[in-house]
Amino acid sequence: MLGAIGVVFGDIGTSPLYALKECFNPEHGVPFSTQTVYGVLSMLFWSMTLVVSIKYVVFVMRADNNGEGGILALTALAMRASSGGARTIRTLMLLGLLGASMFYGDAVITPAISVLSAVEGMEVMTPALQPWVLPLSLIVLVGLFLLQKHGTHVVGRLFGPVMLFWFVLLGLIGLFSVLRSPQILVALNPVHAIEFMFRHAVQAFIVFGSVFLALTGAEALYADMGHFGARPIRYAWFYIAMPCLLLNYFGQGALLLREPSALQNPFFLLMPTWAVAPTIVLATAATVIASQAVISGAFSMTAQAVHLGYAPRMKILYTSDVEIGQIYVPVVNYALLLLVVAVVLAFGKSDNLAAAYGIAVTTTMLLTTGLVTVVMRNAWKWSLPAVALLGTVFLAVDLSFFGANLLKVAAGGWFPLLLGGLIFFLMVTWHTGTQLLKARNVEGGIPLEPFMEGLLSHPPYRVDGTAVYLTPSIEFVPLALLHNLKHNHVLHSRVLFIHFRTQAVPYVEPAKRLVVKTIGDNLYAVAADFGFKETPAVDEIVRMVGERLGIVFEDMETSFFITRATVVPSQLPGMAMWREALFAWMQHNSAKPSDFFRIPANRLVELGSKVEI
């Protein structure tokens, strides 16, 4: 449970730094009064209860894909459970890709707004420190991204204790404030939220977008389920995170009743003067942890997208020999670094960034609701009325937040939408392009087994050693083999044709990983199944095949053959020429097979071919 507190609740746990302050932003036009404080807090309390506690913790977390959560795992589960045709499956896939794409917008905004809001606490100590806020925030953020290549397994042990201390601090300072003004607890009554919405309908709708800031990070409860399990996350939420968060929000509300001038920064003004400086240090540590969780999530999401065929191959490094989930994706890391620095410089203050925050997350939450209803109906076999009732309630809440956040588009919300939309377009282009490439290969493909039978009837010279051909299909002859026979006129004494298949589950049991078929004299067709959270290791597969067949494949006598296709855009049916050119560029710049499949470069033979799509 301590590990879950350190990773899962970092984002939502740092929301008190800015959420309530943003609700009373003067630009929203909310008249300040005791009743509006009650109304805003009541909206916040019931939103957290409905969205986080009921929707995510009770229902969404039940939709685990063999223990894994997250939008892509949910999409794979919904696609597997769907009873619809190809069009329905494609629609579900597109919804999942859109939700995953929007996550990257969140991955840029979260580190920027979290660290900025923590460092801005220095202004509470003295306005003279204001010029240092931006430089110090950038130093913290740049340092965080530069440390990623070393992994987080060492400092990660501190995440749990630091965040536990953070939540205890949130709860205690909030409790002391509530005890001084206990009347704030009347805001627990939903009547105050309803009255606020009726009396100040326009302002309440605008504030709804700011209330949502208190919920950002809720999706992490589901996304990180595979790392910690559902039960520890549920316990940590109900017994630690939620009580401490609510105490702090209500404590800030109580402070506003006593001192309306505290609106400038109610979180830090809740502290005694002597505690502000150490709290800034702790808050910065908490926001770094929250940022780390989002960055690690971006790495994990990218790896899943690559394995599911939604993104080009990328270099994925493993930073820990102990924890399998500790990965580092250099391209994603430096892209996020550049974007985060650009966002901090462009927006300058957490108040300005708050306008950009939320729209991407609400989109992901809305799509999650849609996918979960599919799982409820098709996988859990719930009755249609039950699914319709729950789906309607959740969609009504999600659409309200989505609509309120749409008002922020002009003020900065356009950025995560633009970024998410661009990534979505690239993912769809890549997926469509790979399908076209497979179709072209099948059209001109030569069936493997008849070809090998004919070849062995008049066999070429057999040379010592083992040849491993990585192929997109074990039904057809790999182009690399055709090139090898054409130019070298030899066949190795042992030949493996290996095809990697990604299944719609996170992990595949080792006993079910291989399907090995003998197709001739020391010729074997191998289908190797992997989950979408696993990265294929060719050496390991060759070893497993050897154990299955009772053969020892010596490393230095085994060569790997891969065909690297050069895509040529054409007028053939498919995508527009400019999209085909984009796909060709992405394919050309994808990671080398030796890097992705972890093949020693001195044992790899890469043969090229041109394919028109």
UniProtKB/Swiss-Prot annotation:
It comes from Ralstonia nicotianae (strain ATCC BAA-1114 / GMI1000). Keywords: Cell inner membrane, Cell membrane, Ion transport, Membrane, Plasmid, Potassium, Potassium transport, Symport, Transmembrane, Transmembrane helix, Transport. GO terms for cellular component: plasma membrane. InterPro entries: K+_transporter, K_trans_C, K_trans_N, Kup. It is a multi-pass membrane protein. Belongs to the HAK/KUP transporter (TC 2.A.72) family. It comes from the Bacteria. GO terms for molecular function: potassium ion transmembrane transporter activity; symporter activity. This is Probable potassium transport system protein Kup 1.
